[in-house]
Amino acid sequence: MPAPLETCISDLDCSSSNSSSDLSSFLTDEEDCARLQPLASTSGLSVPARRSAPALSGASNVPGAQDEEQERRRRRGRARVRSEALLHSLRRSRRVKANDRERNRMHNLNAALDALRSVLPSFPDDTKLTKIETLRFAYNYIWALAETLRLADQGLPGGSARERLLPPQCVPCLPGPPSPASDTESWGSGAAASPCATVASPLSDPSSPSASEDFTYGPGDPLFSFPGLPKDLLHTTPCFIPYH
């Protein structure tokens, strides 16, 4: 009988060991669960915290971004205002410089015309020549002086010299030798010129640019007469190439 008893005791020991192992395993599972629960709670709290952290940082950065954007806009507005003011000042300075240049140019032109009038034959005090009239008168005066010098160098009589100087179509228009009395009357009254002078004169040509200005100052012959020069030569001067 001792053998079956020993076997029973051994069976009981095995069963008790098995139950204790089961209990130990159960307890270890409970302990693991108890340990896992705090870990899960801490991890669950940490994950939303991590997720909410960028949101909080973004919310905190929104006012800073708005401030930076406003500052940039202010800087741009200031730059635009400065650039517009600078452009306005540059345009104004350029306009002032252009006006100064134009004023200086007109002053120089008027001074040159006054100097030219000072060397031309004198006119009555109430006579005022325009710019184009002054230039044409100076051109004709220079031409008359040059022809007078050429005639004096050649030593030819006045009539034959005129016939040699004038083109053939103007020779029949030459007047005869005037008497001293008629010459004096013509100087005082301003007699009409020859047909060639009437047709080709740049001073009385209606097609000239300053014809309207030339006609406003009365007859052309006494105005553009040259004292000390033969009057017939002056009447025939328009037969040369017109001044343009």
From Swiss-Prot:
It comes from the Eukaryota. Residues 1-27, 39-82 are annotated as: Disordered. One of its GO terms (biological process) is craniofacial suture morphogenesis. One of its GO terms (cellular component) is perikaryon. Pfam families: HLH. Keywords: Activator, Developmental protein, Differentiation, DNA-binding, Neurogenesis, Nucleus, Transcription, Transcription regulation. Efficient DNA binding requires dimerization with another bHLH protein. This is Neurogenin-1. The lineage of its organism: Eukaryota, Metazoa, Chordata, Craniata, Vertebrata. The gene is Neurog1.
